[in-house]
């Protein structure tokens, strides 16, 4: 079961787990933010324009003259002021931060040795070229592996261990990383992110096939 945090705003309860997709001035996805941060950006006049559906209606104070209560609509996607990060798409050396949760999601929670699907808690990060042999802890040298396969492989290469790698590890683009780090992505947010994926994106192909958001199976 998933625990949903509910916050009372203006007398109504809202699901605080829904995230807002923030973009830069050029429309490039930057990060996921909560509704509190979205309200703060509104107050600082940092939102250029909203996109997508309305997630929340946040109620403010009551105007002493008109007696009307202010209401702020928080959209699923917001374009914000500031420096454009579009240059990230043109940097061949750009690599997003590496962490296990996004790595496992990149590989669809599949062990890339045995091919079975697992929960995050039953998975591990495997270095194709072991660190002890000079391998690096980078996207293109790490794959998702179940703990049994990782233990069997040990500090050997797949060839030395007689194990076949089922897919070639790749470095996600910035937009792909935003997708990988997201949770409960809404349809309009997903459509927006897909438009920023490369044409040859492996993630794009997987999502079109309908298994990009598959959940780990219980084992």
Where would I find each of the regions flagged by the language model?
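Short metal-coordination and nucleic-acid-contact micro-motifs, chiefly zinc-binding Cys/His arrays
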Residues: 104-109, 138-142
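Short helix-coil boundary/hinge micro-motifs
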Residues: 4-95, 100, 163-219
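A generic structural motif
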Residues: 26, 136, 149-151
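Short, conserved, surface-exposed binding loops centered on an aromatic residue
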Residues: 102-106, 115-117
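Histidine-centered nuclease catalytic patch
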Residues: 96, 116-144, 153-169
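Short cysteine-rich clusters marking metal-coordination/redox-active sites
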Residues: 111-114, 146
């Amino acid at each position: 079961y998933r625990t949903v945090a509910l916050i009372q705003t203006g007398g109504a309860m809202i699901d605080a787990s829904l995230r807002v997709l923030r973009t830069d001035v050029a429309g490039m996805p930057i990060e996921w933010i909560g509704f509190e941060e979205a309200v703060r950006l509104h107050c600082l006049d940092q939102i250029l324009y909203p996109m997508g559906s309305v997630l929340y209606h946040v109620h403010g104070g009551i105007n002493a003259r008109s007696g009307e209560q202010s209401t702020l609509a928080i959209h699923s996607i917001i374009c914000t002021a500031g420096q454009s990060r579009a240059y990230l798409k043109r940097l061949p050396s750009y690599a997003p931060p590496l962490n296990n949760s996004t790595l496992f999601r990149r590989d669809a929670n599949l062990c890339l040795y045995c091919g079975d699907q697992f929960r995050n808690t039953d998975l591990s990060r495997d270095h194709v070229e072991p660190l002890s042999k000079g391998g690096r802890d980078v996207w293109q040298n790490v794959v998702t592996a179940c703990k049994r396969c990782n233990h069997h492989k040990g500090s050997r290469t797949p060839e030395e261990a007689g194990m076949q790698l089922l897919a070639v590890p790749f470095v996600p683009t910035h937009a792909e990383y935003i997708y990988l780090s997201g949770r409960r992505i809404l349809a309009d947010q997903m459509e927006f992110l897909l438009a920023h994926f490369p044409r040859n994106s492996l993630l794009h192909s997987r999502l079109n096939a309908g298994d990009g958001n598959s959940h780990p199976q219980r084992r």
